[in-house]
């Protein structure tokens, strides 16, 4: 079903997404090994890895091994930048050895709605006096800032927005 699009678009579309084991979130080696194994299942696999400290290390290693990673469970600009830098290091290491990166499709997914959820809880817990309407835009602000920096630095991974909570999220990202 997806393979024709994958072939036609040279790996940029037509990918099948699969998640590494969430229980490995603190185990860089385990995440990387899981991702590398999943990539052997089909040429169009996009492997999801968590943006934890261990996950970022695994993302670099898996990227180096030619795995198209979707860094997921990302909630902040600093996490998105750590992902971009890890992916760039993996791509550079791979390229330096003459290995192809042409069909790789590295992605970082920022969970905009979940970021909003966390900011609302934190604002309430810390008694921050803020217009409630602004709390629905934290994730979008995070996404837009990360996007600006990705463009400014020339980072190759694409940014995706996920976990929308309201219509404004979709309209603001598009």
What are the language-model segments listed below?
Residues 1-59, 64:
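Active-site beta->alpha loop and helix N-cap motifs at the rims of alpha/beta catalytic domains
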Residues 68-174:
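Catalytic alpha/beta core domains of metabolic enzymes, predominantly
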